[in-house]
Structure formats: C-alpha cells, structure tokens
C-alpha cells in the first residue's frame, strides 16, 4: 500500500463543502472520482478537516492510499486538473508520504483567514471572496478583542449546535488582524477548530468593532460558554483555509 498527500486550492461557492454528502457537489467527491478513474482502483480521499458550504481553500491538505506506486505524479496532477479546473478546483501538488502520515491526525496547526471589505462599494474582482460591510469598523478595538481569544479555553460560545467535536476546549495560538484600504484580513491559528468557530468569532469581533458590544461584554460572551449569546456567524464566503502545518 502506498500513501500520497494532495494539496488543493478551491473556490467553495458552488459546493456543499469539502465532505461528500447525499445531495450536492463536494470537493472531496470531485477529486476522489477522478483519482479512482485514473488510478483504476477505488480510492478514498481523507481531508485535514471539513470546510463548510461556501468556504474556500488556499491550501487544503488531504491523503489517499493506493495499491500500486504512482510512477509519474506530474502526469497524474495534470490529468486531474484538466477535468476539475473549470469547476473551481486546482490540485497544487501530489506527494508520496509515509503510511504514518495522516492528513487530519498528523496536523500540528491549521491556519484560517477571514476577509472583510469595509467600504462603500462591493468588491468585483473578489466577488464572493469576502464579507462586505459598509459601516466603518474600529480596527483597534477589534485587535484588542482578538487578544481575549488567545490561549487554551472553552470555546462553546462559538460552537455550532451540530458540532460533533468531543471537547470544546481549544488552544488559540494566534489571531492577527491587518487592515489596508478597506480590506481587513483576520488570521487564526490553532491545532484544530470547532464547527463554525472561526465564523462565529469573526461575527462577534464585528459586533465589537461596530460598538454594539464593549470589551467587557465581549469577554463576558466568551466566558459564558452559551451559544445563544454569540453574535450571528460571519458568512461563509469570506472564510479561507489558508494552510495546514505538519
């Protein structure tokens, strides 16, 4: 048995998410079907995590096993991309890995990025690649709030009701916020995240930056561990899985 890692870029707008579901198109299925066809055996593609419907990836990581060693990885990559590029998916690389490697369990850190367009006009070049917010946001207050998210804590406030993670305890390694010409990028780094955690944190940071909440209220909401107190999650279109670190 041979194991291979696949690095993937995709626009999630027209997909039900990464994972195969009973209805709708998934990124996992699109690639898995093509791999099985070209390798002439049934393969299962295992991702580093599940991105929700509408969420994009700059570099998703996955792996698959096959019975025969692949002799020409570049040829396989080109063949797959020929059929999936027009669907908004690109395979960036295919690498041979040890059988000990696991796209999900071997991950040391995951990095997500959220983009906000804080300006009057909607984006055209990056349509459906960010959250358009007209009201001026207080970036400095947002940065102060982001520090309250750091460290190991119970993130139940930001956990979707459908989340099946065993524990709500996560360790947020870093939250970095950059703003230039109305474009705001918020980067989150942690070993793993709860379902809708990033979008819920962004939604709550927006409430803070709009002065709907003050820092005291923001911290209270975090510590409450009550989903009902959380601000509405930010839309999926602004979220990107940026990188998985092993």
Swiss-Prot record:
It catalyses: uridine(38/39/40) in tRNA = pseudouridine(38/39/40) in tRNA. Keywords: Isomerase, tRNA processing. One of its GO terms (biological process) is tRNA pseudouridine synthesis. The keyword Isomerase applies. The active site is at 52 (nucleophile). One of its GO terms (molecular function) is tRNA pseudouridine(38-40) synthase activity. Its EC number is 5.4.99.12. Substrate binds at residue 112. InterPro entries: PsdUridine_synth_cat_dom_sf, PsdUridine_synth_TruA, PsdUridine_synth_TruA_a/b_dom, PsdUridine_synth_TruA_C, TruA/RsuA/RluB/E/F_N. Belongs to the tRNA pseudouridine synthase TruA family. Homodimer. Formation of pseudouridine at positions 38, 39 and 40 in the anticodon stem and loop of transfer RNAs. NCBIfam families: hisT_truA. This is tRNA pseudouridine synthase A. It comes from Pelagibacter ubique (strain HTCC1062). The gene is truA.
């Amino acid at each position: 048995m041979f194991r291979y890692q696949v690095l993937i870029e995709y626009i999630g707008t027209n997909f039900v998410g990464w994972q195969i579901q009973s209805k709708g198109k998934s990124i996992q299925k699109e690639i898995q079907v093509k791999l099985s066809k070209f390798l002439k055996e049934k393969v299962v593609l295992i991702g580093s995590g599940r991105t929700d419907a509408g969420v994009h990836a700059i570099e998703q990581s996955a792996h698959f096993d096959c019975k025969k060693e692949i002799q020409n990885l570049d040829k396989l990559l080109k063949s797959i991309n020929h059929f999936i590029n027009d669907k908004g998916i690109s395979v960036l690389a295919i690498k041979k890995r040890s059988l000990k490697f696991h796209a999900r369990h071997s991950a040391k850190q995951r990095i997500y990025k959220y983009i906000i367009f804080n300006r009057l006009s909607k984006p055209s070049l990056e349509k459906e690649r960010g959250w358009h917010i007209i009201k001026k946001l207080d970036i400095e207050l947002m940065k102060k709030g982001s520090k309250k998210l750091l460290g190991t804590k119970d993130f139940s406030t930001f956990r979707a009701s459908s989340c099946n993670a065993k524990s709500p305890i996560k360790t947020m390694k870093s939250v970095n916020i950059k703003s230039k010409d109305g474009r705001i990028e918020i980067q989150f780094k942690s070993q793993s995240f709860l379902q809708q955690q990033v979008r819920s944190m962004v939604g709550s940071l927006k409430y803070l930056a709009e002065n709907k909440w003050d820092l005291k209220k923001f911290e209270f909401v975090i510590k409450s561990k009550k989903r009902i107190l959380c601000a509405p999650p930010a839309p999926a279109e602004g979220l990107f899985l940026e990188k998985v670190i092993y």
